[in-house]
């Protein structure tokens, strides 16, 4: 796949996660909480954990969409001669894939802890179906995030770094000739 296609996949999954997947899980947690007569301490902690996770994931996505993805798009534009040397220099002088990656964190693993806690929890009969739904949602989202992370870490980032290196060589050659 081209880098443009991979970038499109990353952006679309970000939108899907924020607009659909996270809301579905949050709704299931709300239904679970409401299914108990009294507040269930584990569910309240789970809800708090999930809201914090949702916020961290949104921050992670915003950082990628504010820095990493536009930077890669700029590299692609320069490669296709859609931006000039000055614009390329402005874009890259304070940025690099290495700098961006130093600020990049993995948020995929936290869902496993949440799911494992749920699996080990005793439920009452009226909420078993909701627990199973939530566990299935978490497993599915966890797998989806794993694939998303692998595409970023093993395809997008190495190819973007290679493109950056190639363009830096071209840029260095241009400077030598001028």
Task: Say what each PLM segment does.
Residues 1-178:
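Small-residue-biased structural context
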């Amino acid at each position: 796949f081209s880098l443009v296609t991979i970038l499109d996949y990353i952006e679309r999954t970000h939108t899907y996660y924020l607009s659909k997947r996270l809301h579905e899980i949050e709704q299931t947690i709300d239904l679970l909480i409401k299914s108990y007569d009294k507040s269930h301490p584990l569910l309240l902690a789970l809800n708090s954990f999930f809201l914090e996770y949702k916020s961290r994931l949104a921050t992670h996505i915003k950082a990628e969409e504010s820095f990493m993805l536009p930077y890669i798009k700029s590299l692609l534009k320069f490669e296709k001669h859609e931006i000039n040397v000055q614009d390329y220099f402005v874009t890259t002088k304070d940025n690099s894939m290495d700098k961006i990656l130093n600020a990049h964190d993995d948020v995929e693993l936290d869902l496993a802890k949440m799911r494992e806690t749920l699996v080990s929890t005793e439920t009452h009969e009226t909420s078993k179906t909701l627990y199973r739904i939530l566990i299935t949602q978490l497993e599915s989202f966890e797998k989806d995030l794993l694939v998303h992370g692998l595409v970023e870490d093993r395809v997008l980032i190495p190819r973007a770094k290679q493109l950056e290196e190639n363009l830096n060589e071209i840029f260095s050659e241009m400077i030598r000739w001028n």
